[in-house]
């Protein structure tokens, strides 16, 4: 009976983490919709709605702390709880990057200039795929999926480098657009950092499954 209650609590934690991922994916998609359409109302909504994701992280951490104090889990169960706490922190930071993208959109404002967004959108899409895979790998305890997350991170790193070079070159060609392009450089960096956090989530899954630090690269 005690074990059944514990497993139900663990499932609730896992479901809350899944909800966090759904909210974060939605936030990132909306942030890029705002960027592509220059819609400040959507950008502001992303910023305001971030409180929902923050609240979910707090709920996960409070419940995990309560479980550890009450049940005193050891070994695999303890690793599972600690991994979820660490992953929820990573998800919250990714949501913060969606907020940062929205703030950059507001700084860019309405512009008639054609900004190079295609590669940034591709980076966003890869990052979202990584986040979904990271969650699935944890839920299904699938280390192969966790490895796929790390492989995708290499694609993000390559796009980050290519975008940086292209945007710096664009500033030199179009100095009148420097302020807008600098904001795109920030967005490029936010996406690269988001992918790094998702890679850390995959490594947390590997630790949970293997019981030791496990190199996925």
What spans do the regions from the language model cover?
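Cytosolic, long alpha-helical scaffolding segments
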Residues: 1-217
